[in-house]
Amino acid sequence: MNPYAYAATHGPRAGDRVRLGDSGLTIRVESDAQQYGDEFLAGFGKTARDGLHLKAAAVRDTCDVVISNVVVIDAAQGIRKVSIGIREGRICSIGRAGNPDTLAGVDVVVGTGTSIVSGEGLIATAGAVDTHVHLLSPRIMEASLASGVTTVIGQEFGPVWGVGVNSPWALRHAFSAFDAWPVNIGFLGRGSSSDPAPLVEALAEGGASGFKVHEDMGAHTRALDTALRVAEEHDVQVALHSDGLNECLSVEDTLRVLDGRTIHAFHIEGCGGGHVPNVLKMAGVPNVIGSSTNPTLPFGRDAVAEHYGMIVSVHDLKPDLPGDAAMARDRIRAGTMGAEDVLHDLGAIGITSSDAQGMGRAGETVRRTFAMAGKMKAEFGAPEDHDNARVLRYLAKLTINPALAHGLAHEVGSIEVGKLADIVLWRPEFFGAKPQLVLKSGFPAYGVVGDPNAATDTCEPLVLGPQFGAHGATPAEISVAFVAQAALDQGNDRMPTRRRRVAVRGTRGIGPADLRLNSRTGAVDVDQRTGLVTLDGDPIRSEPADSVSLNRLYFL
């Protein structure tokens, strides 16, 4: 077979290159687990049959589901073509699929009772982890799932002024509400309190998995130190939206309060909130895990104009008041927006998130992250004839790094044996924009569906929508609730959710050095007069894009 016919049938081989949508990014397949000439393939007259590449054995001795011959892009695995075996919702094996009785070198034993997801020609990534979601509407989950997000760390439980949920009563109902959605969920408690009692209550009695300290509710010395002390005691993360007015603390003061303790600094560029004008200084600090929210990604020509109205709306400002108008404008800085993209490319900012309905868009984090990668390639070039390193660096910002920051990485964030089979399948031409299928614990949960009255499932109109994993009792059975260990130790669990409870862990004493492929630290400075950003004395800037990829070609 010529290479093009082979790729169309069995997927790309080692050394083949694949373009990712219209992002301008290209990956090169590093290895292929198939045995050429004896490939595993399902279909009429193909090799996935009893006596050939299917082993006649009980499912418990093989796997429940196999994703065959898919190109995996993963911070842990690299970029390789493999098959993925799934048993009881977890990844049980990765490598060559088939029947060890008839094929040498089999890693994924496929039985006559195994369901097959044909991955030939598709790309697999771990489900994205969005750690910054304001849950002001349940419909956010539609946008998140349709973009490839399978884990959400949220705040609020509807259109209320929350910025963290502490009430055990409210958390109980919020967890129950999520039983309708096939996503893993964790809630941040409000950390803006001078007394630890409501924080401990949120963890132990409510099941919160961390804290959010927010300037709108108080990000002063006592509140920040209290949240950090409770977090250190209970091994949970603290997310910080720092004091933008510098009323109580400057960025230098905040770093002194941290005193080396780990924190996750939200929207570290500053337009989403934080110390004006130089919160970006926190990006290079060894104990600060910085993240960006998607409204400023990538830096575009309309970014400055767009954000004024969003800031006014989200923070309940009164633009007729000169002080309120000035506060909004002070947060919008073209220099830091342009530098943000470059700091991501250098690995100095390790996470991207949505800030959904708190200025961000729930369904755009994945595509804006890869649009930013494409913009950086267009502006600064690529060292090789492929973009593997850049693609893996940006994918890590969406998957393993947010999982590491919030203590979820023992369950989600990468395609590794033992982890939940939260896997997103993409057609290469739609990569980053629209998934083909979202598997939640290996079960089809969301994806492309055709006309329900058609003769085949591929008849148009094709739309993204819920699969069987999003119906009935299944969403809760295939998803988990992330909680503090204190909630499990309490022993009087009143949460009625049917989800398995999983304790977060490993959130303290970590920093950028512990993130995958995004470990750059250094002295980041912002000139308060000109807005120029430097990293270790070198100017950091990029130009605003006139257009961005993964956008109008795919969405009206």
From Swiss-Prot:
Catalytic activity: urea + 2 H2O + H(+) = hydrogencarbonate + 2 NH4(+)
Broad class of where this protein is predominantly found: cytoplasm
GO molecular function, one term: nickel cation binding
All residue ranges annotated as the Urease domain in the record: 127-556
UniProt pathway annotation: Nitrogen metabolism; urea degradation; CO(2) and NH(3) from urea (urease route): step 1/1
Compartments in which it is found: Cytoplasm
InterPro entries to which the protein is assigned, alphabetical: Amidohydro-rel, Metal-dep_hydrolase_composite, Metal_Hydrolase, Urease_alpha_N_dom, Urease_alpha_subunit, Urease_asu, Urease_asu_c, Urease_Ni-bd
Binding residues annotated for substrate, in chain numbering: 214
Cofactor note: Binds 2 nickel ions per subunit.
Name of the featured protein: Urease subunit alpha 1
Species per Swiss-Prot/TrEMBL record: Streptomyces avermitilis (strain ATCC 31267 / DSM 46492 / JCM 5070 / NBRC 14893 / NCIMB 12804 / NRRL 8165 / MA-4680)
